[in-house]
Amino acid sequence: ENVAFPLKQRKIDTKLINERVINALKSVGLTGYENRKIQELSGGQQQRVSLARSLVKNAKILLLDEPLVNLDYKLREQLREEFKNLFSKGLADETILIYSTTDPRETMELNGEVIVLDEGKVLQVGPAKEIFENPNSLKVAEISNDPPMNIINSKISKNMINFEDISIDIPIHFKDIKDDELKVGLRSSDILLNEKGHEFEVELAEISGSETLLHLKKGSTKLIMSIEEVMNFKIKDKVKIDFKIDKAYAFSANGKLISSPFRSKNV
Protein backbone atom coordinates (compact mmCIF):
# COMPACT_ATOMS: atom_id res chain seq x y z
CA GLU A 1 0.00 0.00 0.00
CA ASN A 2 2.77 2.41 0.94
CA VAL A 3 4.71 1.87 -2.30
CA ALA A 4 1.56 1.83 -4.43
CA PHE A 5 0.20 5.12 -3.02
CA PRO A 6 1.58 7.51 -5.71
CA LEU A 7 0.20 5.27 -8.48
CA LYS A 8 -3.24 5.04 -6.87
CA GLN A 9 -3.32 8.82 -6.74
CA ARG A 10 -2.95 8.80 -10.51
CA LYS A 11 -5.77 6.23 -10.81
CA ILE A 12 -3.57 3.80 -12.76
CA ASP A 13 -4.90 0.32 -13.63
CA THR A 14 -4.69 -2.03 -10.63
CA LYS A 15 -2.87 -4.76 -12.56
CA LEU A 16 -0.20 -2.31 -13.73
CA ILE A 17 0.15 -0.96 -10.18
CA ASN A 18 0.81 -4.46 -8.83
CA GLU A 19 3.42 -5.17 -11.52
CA ARG A 20 5.29 -1.91 -10.88
CA VAL A 21 5.18 -2.33 -7.09
CA ILE A 22 6.59 -5.87 -7.34
CA ASN A 23 9.38 -4.67 -9.66
CA ALA A 24 10.22 -1.70 -7.42
CA LEU A 25 10.40 -3.88 -4.29
CA LYS A 26 12.60 -6.36 -6.15
CA SER A 27 14.95 -3.53 -7.18
CA VAL A 28 15.53 -2.56 -3.54
CA GLY A 29 15.76 -6.11 -2.20
CA LEU A 30 12.36 -6.25 -0.48
CA THR A 31 10.71 -9.12 -2.36
CA GLY A 32 8.56 -11.02 0.14
CA TYR A 33 7.87 -7.95 2.27
CA GLU A 34 4.83 -6.82 0.26
CA ASN A 35 2.32 -7.31 3.10
CA ARG A 36 4.44 -6.13 6.03
CA LYS A 37 3.30 -3.07 7.98
CA ILE A 38 5.80 -0.22 7.89
CA GLN A 39 6.27 -0.34 11.69
CA GLU A 40 7.34 -3.99 11.39
CA LEU A 41 10.35 -3.03 9.25
CA SER A 42 13.82 -2.02 10.38
CA GLY A 43 15.13 1.49 9.77
CA GLY A 44 17.07 0.34 6.72
CA GLN A 45 14.08 -1.49 5.30
CA GLN A 46 11.92 1.60 5.79
CA GLN A 47 14.56 3.59 3.91
CA ARG A 48 14.31 1.10 1.05
CA VAL A 49 10.51 1.37 1.06
CA SER A 50 10.89 5.13 0.54
CA LEU A 51 13.25 4.46 -2.35
CA ALA A 52 10.84 1.93 -3.88
CA ARG A 53 8.02 4.48 -3.60
CA SER A 54 10.15 6.90 -5.61
CA LEU A 55 11.12 4.28 -8.21
CA VAL A 56 7.59 3.02 -8.78
CA LYS A 57 6.56 6.36 -10.29
CA ASN A 58 9.08 5.96 -13.15
CA ALA A 59 9.95 9.59 -12.61
CA LYS A 60 12.26 11.24 -15.14
CA ILE A 61 14.25 12.80 -12.30
CA LEU A 62 14.91 11.01 -9.01
CA LEU A 63 16.35 13.08 -6.13
CA LEU A 64 17.88 11.31 -3.12
CA ASP A 65 18.93 13.82 -0.47
CA GLU A 66 21.52 12.14 1.82
CA PRO A 67 19.52 8.88 2.00
CA LEU A 68 22.05 7.13 4.27
CA VAL A 69 22.72 9.94 6.73
CA ASN A 70 20.72 8.63 9.72
CA LEU A 71 21.64 4.96 9.45
CA ASP A 72 24.18 2.98 11.45
CA TYR A 73 27.55 2.07 9.96
CA LYS A 74 26.74 -1.53 8.92
CA LEU A 75 23.45 -0.56 7.33
CA ARG A 76 25.07 2.33 5.45
CA GLU A 77 27.64 -0.06 3.99
CA GLN A 78 24.93 -2.55 3.02
CA LEU A 79 22.66 0.02 1.38
CA ARG A 80 25.58 1.74 -0.35
CA GLU A 81 26.32 -1.56 -2.10
CA GLU A 82 22.65 -2.04 -2.96
CA PHE A 83 22.43 1.50 -4.33
CA LYS A 84 25.45 0.79 -6.53
CA ASN A 85 23.74 -2.24 -8.04
CA LEU A 86 20.43 -0.45 -8.37
CA PHE A 87 21.88 2.61 -10.07
CA SER A 88 23.91 0.56 -12.51
CA LYS A 89 21.16 -1.94 -13.41
CA GLY A 90 17.81 -1.06 -11.88
CA LEU A 91 16.95 2.41 -13.20
CA ALA A 92 15.21 3.08 -16.48
CA ASP A 93 17.55 4.43 -19.15
CA GLU A 94 15.75 7.77 -19.28
CA THR A 95 15.84 8.32 -15.49
CA ILE A 96 18.17 11.03 -14.20
CA LEU A 97 19.33 10.35 -10.65
CA ILE A 98 20.48 13.24 -8.46
CA TYR A 99 22.15 11.91 -5.31
CA SER A 100 23.10 14.45 -2.65
CA THR A 101 25.80 13.50 -0.14
CA THR A 102 28.48 15.00 2.08
CA ASP A 103 30.35 11.67 2.22
CA PRO A 104 33.22 11.45 -0.32
CA ARG A 105 33.19 7.64 -0.07
CA GLU A 106 29.65 7.49 -1.40
CA THR A 107 30.67 9.75 -4.27
CA MET A 108 33.53 7.46 -5.25
CA GLU A 109 31.60 4.20 -4.82
CA LEU A 110 28.57 5.33 -6.82
CA ASN A 111 31.03 6.61 -9.45
CA GLY A 112 28.81 8.92 -11.46
CA GLU A 113 29.14 12.45 -12.80
CA VAL A 114 29.86 14.69 -9.81
CA ILE A 115 29.05 18.33 -9.13
CA VAL A 116 30.98 19.74 -6.16
CA LEU A 117 28.99 22.51 -4.46
CA ASP A 118 29.97 24.92 -1.70
CA GLU A 119 27.43 27.43 -0.38
CA GLY A 120 25.46 27.14 -3.61
CA LYS A 121 28.49 27.71 -5.85
CA VAL A 122 29.64 25.08 -8.36
CA LEU A 123 33.35 24.45 -7.77
CA GLN A 124 34.05 21.53 -10.12
CA VAL A 125 32.18 19.15 -12.41
CA GLY A 126 33.41 15.81 -13.72
CA PRO A 127 33.68 12.06 -13.16
CA ALA A 128 34.21 11.04 -9.52
CA LYS A 129 37.67 9.60 -10.24
CA GLU A 130 38.83 12.78 -12.00
CA ILE A 131 37.72 15.00 -9.12
CA PHE A 132 39.38 12.72 -6.56
CA GLU A 133 42.65 12.62 -8.50
CA ASN A 134 42.69 16.25 -9.67
CA PRO A 135 40.72 18.55 -7.34
CA ASN A 136 40.97 21.98 -8.97
CA SER A 137 41.25 23.88 -5.68
CA LEU A 138 41.94 23.54 -1.97
CA LYS A 139 38.22 23.69 -1.22
CA VAL A 140 37.45 20.79 -3.58
CA ALA A 141 40.36 18.82 -2.08
CA GLU A 142 38.85 19.32 1.39
CA ILE A 143 35.32 18.40 0.32
CA SER A 144 36.29 15.34 -1.74
CA ASN A 145 38.41 13.66 0.94
CA ASP A 146 37.52 12.14 4.31
CA PRO A 147 39.43 13.05 6.41
CA PRO A 148 40.01 16.34 4.54
CA MET A 149 43.30 16.55 2.66
CA ASN A 150 46.19 17.82 4.81
CA ILE A 151 47.39 21.24 3.68
CA ILE A 152 50.96 22.26 4.56
CA ASN A 153 52.17 25.84 4.10
CA SER A 154 55.58 25.35 2.50
CA LYS A 155 58.45 27.13 0.78
CA ILE A 156 60.35 25.77 -2.20
CA SER A 157 64.11 26.34 -2.24
CA LYS A 158 66.93 24.47 -3.98
CA ASN A 159 64.58 21.67 -5.04
CA MET A 160 63.44 21.13 -1.46
CA ILE A 161 60.02 21.49 0.19
CA ASN A 162 60.56 23.30 3.49
CA PHE A 163 58.17 23.70 6.45
CA GLU A 164 58.82 23.94 10.19
CA ASP A 165 62.33 22.38 10.54
CA ILE A 166 61.63 19.80 7.84
CA SER A 167 63.17 19.69 4.34
CA ILE A 168 62.07 17.11 1.77
CA ASP A 169 63.23 16.55 -1.81
CA ILE A 170 60.58 17.76 -4.23
CA PRO A 171 58.82 15.07 -6.29
CA ILE A 172 59.26 14.94 -10.05
CA HIS A 173 55.88 16.54 -10.75
CA PHE A 174 56.93 19.65 -8.74
CA LYS A 175 60.05 20.27 -10.88
CA ASP A 176 58.57 22.95 -13.16
CA ILE A 177 56.76 24.90 -10.44
CA LYS A 178 57.90 28.53 -10.34
CA ASP A 179 56.17 29.57 -7.10
CA ASP A 180 58.43 30.00 -4.05
CA GLU A 181 55.55 29.51 -1.62
CA LEU A 182 53.09 26.66 -1.94
CA LYS A 183 50.34 24.88 -0.12
CA VAL A 184 51.27 21.20 -0.29
CA GLY A 185 48.40 18.72 -0.06
CA LEU A 186 48.72 15.17 1.27
CA ARG A 187 45.99 12.68 2.05
CA SER A 188 45.91 11.11 5.51
CA SER A 189 46.80 7.74 3.96
CA ASP A 190 50.00 9.21 2.47
CA ILE A 191 51.56 9.86 5.88
CA LEU A 192 53.36 6.89 7.43
CA LEU A 193 54.88 5.92 10.76
CA ASN A 194 58.67 5.78 10.44
CA GLU A 195 61.12 5.50 13.35
CA LYS A 196 63.65 7.49 11.32
CA GLY A 197 61.11 10.15 10.36
CA HIS A 198 60.07 13.59 11.60
CA GLU A 199 58.78 13.99 15.15
CA PHE A 200 55.22 15.21 15.70
CA GLU A 201 53.04 15.35 18.80
CA VAL A 202 49.70 13.55 19.08
CA GLU A 203 46.80 15.95 19.72
CA LEU A 204 44.04 13.35 19.37
CA ALA A 205 43.77 9.64 18.56
CA GLU A 206 40.52 8.21 17.17
CA ILE A 207 39.54 4.62 16.49
CA SER A 208 37.23 4.38 13.46
CA GLY A 209 36.28 0.77 12.73
CA SER A 210 39.54 -1.04 12.01
CA GLU A 211 41.41 2.22 11.40
CA THR A 212 43.25 4.66 13.68
CA LEU A 213 43.21 8.39 12.95
CA LEU A 214 45.99 10.46 14.50
CA HIS A 215 45.73 14.24 14.76
CA LEU A 216 49.32 15.51 14.85
CA LYS A 217 51.03 18.84 15.45
CA LYS A 218 54.47 20.33 14.92
CA GLY A 219 54.76 24.08 15.37
CA SER A 220 51.89 25.63 13.41
CA THR A 221 51.51 22.58 11.15
CA LYS A 222 48.61 20.24 11.91
CA LEU A 223 48.10 16.91 10.15
CA ILE A 224 45.76 13.94 10.20
CA MET A 225 47.19 10.52 9.37
CA SER A 226 45.29 7.26 8.99
CA ILE A 227 46.67 3.88 10.04
CA GLU A 228 44.98 0.75 8.71
CA GLU A 229 44.94 -1.02 12.07
CA VAL A 230 43.85 -0.29 15.63
CA MET A 231 46.72 1.25 17.61
CA ASN A 232 46.77 2.90 21.03
CA PHE A 233 48.17 6.41 21.37
CA LYS A 234 47.82 9.03 24.09
CA ILE A 235 47.57 12.78 23.80
CA LYS A 236 51.07 14.35 23.76
CA ASP A 237 52.71 11.10 22.67
CA LYS A 238 55.60 11.72 20.29
CA VAL A 239 55.50 9.87 16.97
CA LYS A 240 57.86 9.88 14.02
CA ILE A 241 56.38 10.04 10.55
CA ASP A 242 57.37 10.25 6.92
CA PHE A 243 55.54 11.37 3.80
CA LYS A 244 54.72 9.74 0.47
CA ILE A 245 55.87 12.92 -1.20
CA ASP A 246 55.35 11.44 -4.68
CA LYS A 247 51.61 11.55 -3.82
CA ALA A 248 51.70 15.27 -2.93
CA TYR A 249 49.61 18.01 -4.53
CA ALA A 250 50.76 21.58 -5.11
CA PHE A 251 48.33 24.46 -4.69
CA SER A 252 49.07 28.15 -5.22
CA ALA A 253 48.73 30.74 -2.46
CA ASN A 254 45.19 31.49 -3.70
CA GLY A 255 44.24 27.81 -3.52
CA LYS A 256 44.31 26.79 -7.18
CA LEU A 257 45.76 23.44 -8.23
CA ILE A 258 49.22 23.73 -9.79
CA SER A 259 50.29 20.10 -9.92
CA SER A 260 48.97 16.68 -8.94
CA PRO A 261 50.63 13.25 -8.95
CA PHE A 262 48.23 12.32 -11.75
CA ARG A 263 48.54 15.43 -13.91
CA SER A 264 50.53 18.67 -13.92
CA LYS A 265 49.27 22.02 -15.12
CA ASN A 266 50.09 25.70 -14.88
CA VAL A 267 47.84 28.05 -12.95
Residue ranges and their predicted role:
Residues 149, 160-267:
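Non-catalytic connector elements of ABC transporters
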Residues 133-158:
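C-terminal boundary and immediately downstream tail of ABC-type ATPase nucleotide-binding domains
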Residues 1-136:
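ABC ATPase nucleotide-binding domains
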Residues 105, 129, 138, 150, ...:
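Glycine-centered loop/turn positions within well-structured domains
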Residues 77, 151-153, 193:
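Generic structural "secondary-structure junction" signal
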